[in-house]
Amino acid sequence: MAQKIQSVKGMNDLLPVGQKDFKLTAVFWQAFEDTVNRWTRAYGYQQIRTPIVEQTGLFVRSIGEETDVVGKEMYTFSDSNDSLSLSLRPEGTASCLRAVVEHNLLYNSPQKLWYMGPMFRRERPQKGRYRQFHQVGIEALGFEGPDIDAEIIAMSADLWEKLGIREYLTLEINSLGNREERAAHRAALVEYLTRYEAQLDEDSKRRLKTNPLRVLDTKNPDLQEICNAAPRLVDYLGEASQNHYARFKAMLDGLGIQYIENSRLVRGLDYYNQTVFEWTTDKLGAQATVCGGGRYDGLIEELGGKPAPSIGFAMGIERLLLLVSEYGSLEVNAAPDVYAMHQGEGADLQVMKYAQALRAQGFNVIQHSGYQSLKAQMKKADNSGARFALIVAQDELADGTVTLKDMNGAHGQQTVSATDLTDTLQQWKNA
C-alpha cells in the first residue's frame, strides 16, 4: 500500500465533521461566512478578492522590512521564469490597497471594501495560530476624521453581538500619532531602553536596533517592569493628534462602547499611525488578540497612489470561531429538509424527479443512491438529520401517491397525492 501523504503542518483541512486537533467544521464556517456577508452589506461595504501570491516587494514596502512578519514569517520563493521574488500573502491590507491603486478605485470617491480569505505565515503551530489561517478584513479608504475610526469599532462590536461573544471581548486602544511624533518618541525610547540593554532578551535586543517600538509589545514577564516605565508615545503627541484621539474617544463614549487605553499597544506592522486598537479575550490562552487594526494614512501613497487617509481592521477566523464555538451562538442548519428514498422497480427514477421538483421549490433534499432495504434507507434518513422522509414505492407509482414521514413525529406518516407533495411539505415545515 502506498504511503499516505499528510497535510502540511499548521495547515488544516476543513471537513464536514470536526477533527481531533481542529474541531471547526465546514458547515460552522459557512454559517459564519453567511453572517459576515449580511453584516458587511448592512454597513455598505463591497467585497474585493485578490490573489494569494504577490510580489515580495509589496510586503517589504508596506509592512516593513524589519518586521517579524517580513523578516521571519513569510513564505517567499522565486518565479522560475524571471527570478521575480514572490510571497504568499501574510495579511490582507497590502494586497487590497495594491489592487485599489492598480485599478484606480479611489479616482471618484472613497471606498469601503472587505475581504475574506487565507493568509500564510511560517509560525509555530498551536491552538489559534496556524501557518495557513483565514482573515476577514475591513478597509475604509479615503476617510480622514475620527468618526470613521469610531464607526468601524462600532461595526466590529456589532458583529460580536451577532455571534454572542461581546461579553468575552475587551477593546484596547492607543494613538501612535504621526511620523514626526513617532520619531521623537523613538529617540527617547531608544535612549531609555539602551540603559537596560543588558537585561533585554535576544528578541528585544534585535528589536531595539530595528523597530524599538515593538520592544514594548514583548510578552516576556521579566521585561514588563522596564516596559511599563518606558516613555509613552501619547506624551509626544502634538495638538492635532491629541484632538483626533480625544474626539475618537468621545465618540466611543457616546456610543456606549467601553475601552481600555493601552499605551503599549503598537501593533506588529509598520504602516500604522494615529488610532490603533485590538479586541482581546482571556478565553483562548496565549492567543488573546481576536481582531486588530488602525489607521494607515500614508500607506496608499507609499504604494504609488495619491494620498488617502484610511483605516481598517482584520480578524482571524479560526481564532474567532474557536471563541464562538465555546462561548457564543451561531445558527447552523446543515440538515436537509427531506431525505428521499425509493423501493421497487421504477421508483428510483421517479424519486429523482420528485427530488428535483422539491429543490426547485426551495427544499434541500438528499436523494438516496443505491438499492438497499427500506429499513436501511430509513436509518440513513435518520442519521442525516432530515426533518422529513419521502418514500416512493413501486406499488404507489400507478396511482400517483407517495408516503411522507415527519421524522420529529408531529405529523406521523401519511400517504399523499404526488400533486400535493410540495404543499403538504410546506405546511408541515411551517407548522
Curated annotation (Swiss-Prot):
Q: Which GO terms describe its molecular function?
A: ATP binding; histidine-tRNA ligase activity
Record-listed E.C. numbers: 6.1.1.21
Query: Keyword Ligase on this protein?
Result: yes
| A Pfam family annotated for this UniProt entry | HGTP_anticodon
Q: What class of enzyme is it?
A: ligase
Name the family: Belongs to the class-II aminoacyl-tRNA synthetase family.
Output this protein's name. Answer: Histidine--tRNA ligase
* Originating gene: hisS
